[in-house]
UniProtKB/Swiss-Prot annotation:
It is found in: Cytoplasm; Nucleus. CDD domains: proteasome_alpha_type_4 (cd03752). NCBIfam families: PRK03996.1. It comes from the Eukaryota. SMART domains: Proteasome_A_N (SM00948). One of its GO terms (cellular component) is nucleus. One of its GO terms (biological process) is proteasome-mediated ubiquitin-dependent protein catabolic process. The proteasome is a multicatalytic proteinase complex which is characterized by its ability to cleave peptides with Arg, Phe, Tyr, Leu, and Glu adjacent to the leaving group at neutral or slightly basic pH. The proteasome has an ATP-dependent proteolytic activity. Belongs to the peptidase T1A family. The gene is PAC1. This is Proteasome subunit alpha type-4. Keywords: Cytoplasm, Nucleus, Proteasome. PANTHER family: PROTEASOME SUBUNIT ALPHA/BETA. The 26S proteasome consists of a 20S proteasome core and two 19S regulatory subunits. The 20S proteasome core is composed of 28 subunits that are arranged in four stacked rings, resulting in a barrel-shaped structure. The two end rings are each formed by seven alpha subunits, and the two central rings are each formed by seven beta subunits. The catalytic chamber with the active sites is on the inside of the barrel.
Amino acid sequence: MSRRYDSRTTIFSPEGRLYQVEYAMEAIGNAGSAIGILAKDGVVLIGEKKVTSKLLQTSTSTEKMYKIDDHVACAVAGIMSDANILINTARVQAQRYTFSYQEPMPVEQLVQSLCDTKQGYTQFGGLRPFGVSFLFAGWDKNYGFQLYMSDPSGNYGGWKATAIGANNQAAQSMLKQDYKDDVTREDAVKLALKALSKTMDSTSLTSEKLELAEVYLLPSGKVKYQVHSPESLNRLLTESGLTQPAAETS
């Protein structure tokens, strides 16, 4: 019965469902996991890289983490070509705001603007939804550090800790148990690594399969976006007790 209603994005089924939007969300369920944690002194983003070839130029390529503006970054799960379009759109919106008002764009306003674009692709004929979910991490003078999650429908919400992608339920369950409101950035990194290990085969948890980024404030008050190097990731994995013997010899 559903096949009569799922060919177009603009037609509701008798149950009130938009099947193409639901299918887009299913595509994200097969993508590499991404986790975001809001700490009292920053925001931590971590993601599972699916492309781990030795031939890849890792120094110039990021699969999961992207900088949108000096004060906002995001982690991605889903179809990367769709994500690139939306990331570029967000960057342009942020620059236009800065040019017009001479100050950084508020984080939630940027997220809402991008989600309006995503929602439009669920409402007009001849278009398909963007098959990608985002975790946005940022800081502004209005609300301080913030973490938002958005899905293909254009819906978004603020979170203290959340996960998207494959096996995100396992990560969500661990975050519910272990997250504390006064968590520091250092402890948030350890919790993020621990939660991501639950979504992956823990024996394959190596720096080559991870991307870790942080958004925090420098003593000068400037927002800093930092992506960890493979060496830093290896050290963090060792400190967290997540590095397996097989990974150390590879």
